[in-house]
Amino acid sequence: MENNTILKKYPMNKIMTSMLLFGFIITGFSDLLLHGKMSYSSIMGMNTSRVYFYTFFLLIIGCWLLYNKWFVGIGFICLATFSSYFTEYVSIHNYFASIAIYFGLIIDVIIRKKMKWLIPLIIVGLLQGIAFQTGWFGYYMVGFMEFSGLCIGSIFIIKTI
């Protein structure tokens, strides 16, 4: 009886989306802490087995989000495509793919008319951009901004499904 109530209150696509997004956040963050890295990008490109794992994970998340009509899925697919493991893709990974996620999320916010969500996303995006460009914040700040951006974006997506 309780199981039926949970599925009525939370649709299956909301449960699946939250499992995928927060599964990625928790897996990446724990992997990051265990290996002493400073950002999600650095842990994703650490070795070939991680490249395969995170690429597959990001492709699943991106396709799932696109299937559920979320443009931010394009950004996840870009992150999967341009892995930071390959040195020729590092700048594309750091700039194009990260920006694609923010643009996709901003488009999703505008389409769903939830403008108050733009404020924290813009703040986190600007701080992450500054952290990438300067050594002023250090790379720990880049990792913290990646974590914050992923959490804020994931909460927005899950709340509005």
Residue ranges with predicted function:
Residues 1-66:
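N-terminal topogenic module of multi-pass integral membrane proteins
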